[in-house]
């Protein structure tokens, strides 16, 4: 099965129509967008479609409940800036390894923004995409 996972490209199983955010968007607006589309993260992109950050429902929701944000708080204020991405031609096995960056349960990444050779966002791959792919193999 390992060899099979090495031969399946990220671009073949990723979600291509990615819901994104811009740094100037408000956190409430971004949270509503995540709830509307039933997604758990938003890659933050610049005007050239390059990934500059990421926000998650957990991060935003938790802090909204605790009143840590004002109505003026933007995605740029709260996004994670050191985003781990993966190239569209990488293998599923590489994606799995990137998602488990430290081997610690609390540090597993659930989604990876997928970029092309110009570092532009072309998709997103989730743990669910990978599980569905593996379930077809076994």
UniProtKB/Swiss-Prot annotation:
Keywords: CBS domain, Repeat. InterPro entries: CBS_dom (IPR000644), CBS_dom_sf (IPR046342), CBS_domain-containing (IPR051462). SMART domains: CBS. PROSITE patterns: CBS. Residues 14-70, 79-138 form the CBS domain. This is Uncharacterized protein MJ0922.
